[in-house]
Amino acid sequence: MENKFTPFIGIEYIKFGSDRSDVNISINSDSEVFTRNEIAENSTDYYKDLGFFVEYDSNNKCEAIEFTKDSGLLYEGRNLFDLSYSKLRTIYDSISNEMEEEDKLGCTYHDLGFAVSKSTEDDNIESVLIFSKNYWR
C-alpha cells in the first residue's frame, strides 16, 4: 500500500492529533502495542501487516508515524522507498532549510516534516518517520 503524506498533517486516514481509538478504527487492523524506549511518553502501535508504527503523545494523540521499507510512502508524487538514500538527499537537501544529519545514520528535514533512517550496510532507506509540528519540541 502506498501512503500519501502531507507534512505536519499525516496521511489520508491518519491525521496528527487524532485520538488513538480513532486511529485504530480507521486502520481496522491488528497491532502490537509496546514502549519503544525509556523516554517515550506513551506506547506505540505497530501494524506489522501494513509496515508502520504509530506513536502517541501523553494524551493518546497521534504525533508521528514511522514507515518501514515494507510499506510505501508517497511525498510529492515520489515513493521515498524507491529512492536511494543519496538520491533522496540530493533532492531534498536542496529544498530544505532545516536539514539535520544524524551521526551518518540518517537525517531529519524539520521544515518538511520527515526524517529518514538509512542502512549502515548500503545506500538503502530503512525507515521514514513523518511527524507533527510539535514532535521535536
Per-segment meaning from a language model:
Residues 1-137:
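Short helix/turn-capping signatures at newly exposed starts of structured segments
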